Amino acid sequence: MLDRIKIALQHLLPKRWLTELAGWGAERRGGWLTRGVITLFVRWYKVDMQEAQQPDVATYPTFNAFFVRPLRDEARPIDADPAVLVLPADGIISQLGPIEGEQVFQAKGHHYSLEALLAGNESMITRFRDGSFATTYLAPRDYHRVHMPCNGVLREMLYVPGELFSVNPLTAANIPNLFARNERIICLFDTDFGPMAQILVGATIVGSIETVWAGTVTPPREGIIKRWRYPQADADGAVVLLKGQEMGRFKLGSTVINLFAGKNVLLGEHLYTRYVTRVGQRLAHGIAQTDSPLT
């Protein structure tokens, strides 16, 4: 009964207004009030502040500064094997596995299509048809910077407007096409293992989504699809990111979806639904192509 009420509220609450209000409040310098809110958040969600570069909550002038806190360098070692792709975020595995034609598994009884997820971008749809995917859910207590699974050259970015449903496991199990309905940023990379998409999905109370090359992408929320193209690795203006390097961040938490093309990326057999993830740990084994797009 309680779960039904929670799902009903997802449809009834003014999600966009709540998200804008939360984003506004999270950027305010509230002095003792900000420190109090952060302290309560740390206690309620059992956040491990000893992993942070600045463990003292008094050092954070705003809630957002706390929320995107950097970790100590040694807190997330990156698997150094060049054939290993690593987990992009702290959280849990929501789902992972093969893309069956153009269908991506969301939860029991629910799939969504590549066409819907990728906003009808035919070139991307063709790349990832019959590929593989991994979906990582970031809970409020988690570290909220997103990192690269492998070396990559950014070739395209799409901003897709949409809903702002919560993306927690309960909502994923009950709202059809959730990740294809929510606001999202789609980042397409060329890698040694073929094309890879890293998709940052918005949600209720996610005040903004940022990337390291473009800064804040949303807000503003203008209701139109936006597209940016980027040059190959050896051209002026190229965006080249290395494995384990930060590529984006959420203010507050949400979901990351990775899409891999073909059969060159073999997801780790040790992974399963609700597996606890940490940045830098093994996600998959990759079979490198002959010609590297990074050279």
From Swiss-Prot:
Chief location of this protein within or outside the cell: membrane
Modified residues (Pyruvic acid (Ser)): 254
InterPro entries according to UniProt: PS_Dcarbxylase, PSD-B, PSD_type1_pro
Recorded metabolic or biological pathway in which this protein acts: Phospholipid metabolism; phosphatidylethanolamine biosynthesis; phosphatidylethanolamine from CDP-diacylglycerol: step 2/2
Biological processes per GO annotation: phosphatidylethanolamine biosynthetic process
Record's cofactor remark: Binds 1 pyruvoyl group covalently per subunit.
EC code: 4.1.1.65
Cofactor(s) needed: pyruvate
Cellular component terms (Gene Ontology): plasma membrane
Membrane association type: Peripheral membrane protein
Keywords tagged on the record: Cell membrane, Decarboxylase, Lipid biosynthesis, Lipid metabolism, Lyase, Membrane, Phospholipid biosynthesis, Phospholipid metabolism, Pyruvate, Zymogen
Site (Cleavage (non-hydrolytic)): 253-254
Single GO molecular function: phosphatidylserine decarboxylase activity
Catalysed transformations (reactions): a 1,2-diacyl-sn-glycero-3-phospho-L-serine + H(+) = a 1,2-diacyl-sn-glycero-3-phosphoethanolamine + CO2
Subunit structure: Heterodimer of a large membrane-associated beta subunit and a small pyruvoyl-containing alpha subunit.
Family label: Belongs to the phosphatidylserine decarboxylase family. PSD-B subfamily. Prokaryotic type I sub-subfamily.
Record's protein name: Phosphatidylserine decarboxylase proenzyme
Organism for this UniProt entry: Sodalis glossinidius (strain morsitans)
The organism's taxonomic lineage, starting at the top: Bacteria, Pseudomonadati, Pseudomonadota, Gammaproteobacteria, Enterobacterales
